Amino acid sequence: MPELRLSGNCAHMSDHPLLRRLPASTDCSSDELLSLFLDYIAEKKLELYPAQEEAILELFEDRNVILGTPTGSGKSLVATAMHFRSMAQGRRSIYTCPIKALVNEKFMALCRDFGPDNVGMATGDATVNRDAPILCCTAEILANYALRDGDRAPFREVIMDEFHFYADQERGVAWQVPLLTMSKSRFLLISATLGTPDFFQKEVTRLTGAETVIVSSTQRPVPLEFSYVETSVDVTLQELIAANKAPVYLVHFTQNDAAQAAQDLMSLNFCSTAEKTAIKEIMAGAKFTSPYGKEVKKYLQHGIGIHHAGLLPKYRVLVEKLAQSGLLKVICGTDTLGVGVNVPIRTVVLTKLSKYGGQKVATLSAREFHQITGRAGRRGFDDIGYVVAQAPEHVIENSKMEARAAGDVKKMRKMVKKKPPEGFVGWSEDTFKKLQTATSEPLVSRFQVSHGMLLQVLSRPDDGCHAMLKLIKDSHETAGAKKRHKERAWQLFRALIDRKIVEIVPVAQRGGGSKLRLNVELQEDFSLNHALSLYLIDALALIDPNSPTYAVDVMTLCESILEDPDVILRRQLSKVKDEAMAAMKADGLPYEERISKLEELEYPKPNRDFIYNTFNDFAAAHPWVGQENIRPKSIAREMFENFRSFADYIHDYDLHRAEGVLLRHLSSVYKVLAQTVPEAAKTESVQEMEAWLAGILRGTDSSLLDEWERLRDPNWKPTEEKPAEAPDITRNKREFTALIRTEIFRFLRPLAMQNPDIALAALGAGAAGWTADQLRALLDEYLAGHERIRLDNEARNGRHTYLKPDDSNQTWHVSQVLIDPEELNDWQIEFSVDLRQAREEGKPFLVLLNIGPVHAV
């Protein structure tokens, strides 16, 4: 590989300690490089643990290393050493882990050490500084390099963090692929819960031809103290805090349990007045505008954190910030803390030792237990970390009754012991002790063939078909499984040929090159991340772009290829059943018949028959679809069609504790619209719908959208973090206009249904000075010459909305033409919109000015 020229301004090298230490020439011995890196460690006043020292020495001897040491034992420093050696020798290195937030965190840390010009990042959506000497990415990005380039992959050093994800059912294949193809690389595999790594030692040595060394240790920088208690959670927490063992992370295995625990703890006082004042100071400027925001704010001001995937990202970030300041005594969260959640913890309290794993409730695995408990104890802050396990609730209750009986035989006889709930998977102190010493289970191969994998391999300049067969042959699978993978690969290949995404190059045109050619007509960032994307491309061609419902039908297809957000769909079905039950009661149907009919109901599935029928046809012709299935649903579509804001939808379905779930689904729909739907399929109405969705995301929690846009900007460079500011929802005119139009139709909808009171309520303070009687009189005047106000797709077409900014462009005059069945379209509603207020509140604020015949403005 040619020598890499280091970029960056030399005047600022002193700001980046490892960039400053890079030798002028790449012709430098390992001993010299090691000495330079040890100088860096000395400057940071760090002292290497034996395992760290051993691993670094082995890496500088050009060996592969499998590093299995506990959480907090400095594995990141070993990875940094590998990056330094690689860059000093003019090569490229790549760091990968499973979580985008961790990739971002590592990216920022490496930028500080090596300078931002020398570090890139990729998380699956887009990339920043892709060709930098150091790249931080998710495992799937590395897997794509490994599939597309094989042993020609541009990275000589490969660091795979959280390597136990190798056994993840869905994503594990991404951790395996580099170990099958990147034969010219050196590997550093990192995990605190590897189990027995001998198999990987042999495989990595076989692949690279270089020795692979296992460096392992059970010695923790901060030792753990374990205890099992039969006291209620509130008593346990009070005792821990009194003993100076905070911050405490209270572990639950469902988001709802974590949220309920935070609510239950509000009756206890964990923080002093001074601490609460400090919390309020840090929270100053934070916006809690979502429906659940008031609850989150209340918990935080009381010194109680909450942390789970159902929260909006901005709230999780705030919780982490407060926790890092040492101001939160208790954090109620889920077991996701085991995967790199940036929350400092002294004590971990396990509320249970069993959890639902998707199919059944079972005792925690050794790996799950060690991942969770390993977060207790903060290196540099704590001398010891604490792990507390709660006994089952019925055991705690029985223990309380026995304590009240105080050995009184009569009371003991009368006592009725509480029984565990039906189907309960219990645990005991013995269970707890066994988990403490248990070795993590062996990592199981999750290799699988997908059309995305096939596309990457077939894009190689040489014989991609042969490379695909070799990939399957070298996989860590059984002989029987390899046979099935070959069959599936053939089915996938035929499907890609049939869809013309892959073409066979005629012999006369090959000229010694590849036998295959990828179709390059799809947009540059065309995404095949979703297994059903090929179906989406097919189905888009079957719907009429001139149909008045074309835009929402496109959205339905996008939603159909995404995973089901179950909590939202359950609430939708519940609402459908409630409405059906009320209607059947009114019709006088017998109870048994009502119950029978309820069982037949399902949540809304627009174009249900079209989607199922076209998908069945697609699956019949393309057996590679395998276990995949289409999932029609209407969440983003329902919001769009019914003019619902994010807050409206949360209230409609009581999703306060699952705001993050709704945000992620909407974000996924937006990404499919933006990245997978071909530009040729995007009519003006689709583009407007896409802008509306972007506006909803930006106004709710801009972090996901900002990351998406930042990563799509090739010129973006990291800077020091600044205090968080509210997102400017007015910066994108198209998005902001779409939000204004949604607010207009939130007013128009009840007005069209002759409910002026509800219409005024929709405007809130923007209806000041107006009365329901005034609206009713104007509506009567309108209806005297028009049948009704239309609310269909034509009525909401953007061409019927007119904007006129004032000279300062801080206030817009907005006119909305009312569309009627006679198509006279001669009335309008006028509003003013204050952009300053919109920026402050994170949503457009409409003031009603006038309703009447169209006139020049």
Kindly give the residue locations of the regions a language model identified.
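Conserved segment of the helicase C-terminal RecA-like domain
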Residues: T347-L350, S354-Y356, A362-A403
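Conserved interdomain hinge at the start of the Helicase C-terminal
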Residues: V229-F253, Q260, V317-S325
